[in-house]
UniProtKB/Swiss-Prot annotation:
Regulates the trafficking and gating properties of AMPA-selective glutamate receptors (AMPARs). Promotes their targeting to the cell membrane and synapses and modulates their gating properties by regulating their rates of activation, deactivation and desensitization. Blocks CACNG8-mediated resensitization of AMPA receptors. PANTHER family: CORNICHON-RELATED. Acts as an auxiliary subunit for AMPA-selective glutamate receptors (AMPARs). Found in a complex with GRIA1, GRIA2, GRIA3, GRIA4, CNIH3, CACNG2, CACNG3, CACNG4, CACNG5, CACNG7 and CACNG8 Interacts with CACGN8. Interacts with GRIA1. Found in a complex with GRIA1, GRIA2, GRIA3, GRIA4, DLG4 and CACNG8. It comes from Rattus norvegicus. GO terms for cellular component: AMPA glutamate receptor complex; dendrite; dendritic shaft; dendritic spine; endoplasmic reticulum membrane; glutamatergic synapse; postsynaptic density; postsynaptic density membrane. One of its GO terms (biological process) is regulation of membrane potential. GO terms for molecular function: signaling receptor binding. Its main location: endoplasmic reticulum. The keyword Repeat does not apply. Keywords: Cell membrane, Cell projection, Endoplasmic reticulum, Membrane, Postsynaptic cell membrane, Synapse, Transmembrane, Transmembrane helix. Brain. Expressed in the neocortex, hippocampal formation, and cerebellum (at protein level). Residues 32-72, 160 are lumenal. Belongs to the cornichon family. This is Protein cornichon homolog 2.
């Protein structure tokens, strides 16, 4: 049983992957909250309720934006660690999501410093559906990755 840099990478990745799973679960809950608030017909004509709904939507979008850069950074750190540890299969499994994160980050709205999740555009049903599907796909990826990292960590520790 040997403790190598690859084993350390897998251990750190397990902890960080658990945090990414919680980030994505929070995204799913937030999008469901937005969808429910969007479809709620109660008090549609009440201006006070409309202001309250808008403030709630802006608050949720602000919290969503705060999780984007940490999620992308943590996943980039995964890829960098696996590159340094020469874990090519694991790096190959993570590269597609890394490229998607880079594409998504560099194709953010050009009108400001907002990464994404604008309060006005997120209430478009198509964008909301897309964001929710994206979150479910990321949850599946991170869950499968978590168990792959767990297996790889044990294999790396036992094989030497």
């Amino acid at each position: 049983m040997a403790f190598t840099f690859a084993a350390f990478c897998y251990m750190l990745t397990l902890v960080l992957c658990a945090s990414l799973i919680f980030f994505v679960i929070w995204h799913i809950i937030a999008f469901d909250e937005l969808r429910t608030d969007f479809k709620n017909p109660i008090d549609q004509g009440n201006p006070a309720r409309a202001r309250e709904r808008l403030k709630n939507i802006e608050r949720i979008c602000c919290l969503l934006r705060k999780l984007v850069v940490p999620e992308y950074s943590i996943h980039g750190l995964f890829c960098l660690m696996f590159l340094c540890a020469a874990e090519w299969v694991t790096l190959g499994l993570n590269i597609p999501l890394l490229f998607y994160h880079l594409w998504r980050y560099f194709h953010r709205p050009a009108d400001g410093s907002e990464v994404m999740y604008d309060a006005v555009s997120i209430m478009n049903a198509d964008i909301l559906n897309y964001c929710q599907k994206e979150s479910w796909c990321k949850l599946a990826f991170y869950l499968l990755s978590f168990f792959y990292y767990l297996y790889s960590m044990v294999y790396t520790l036992v094989s030497f």
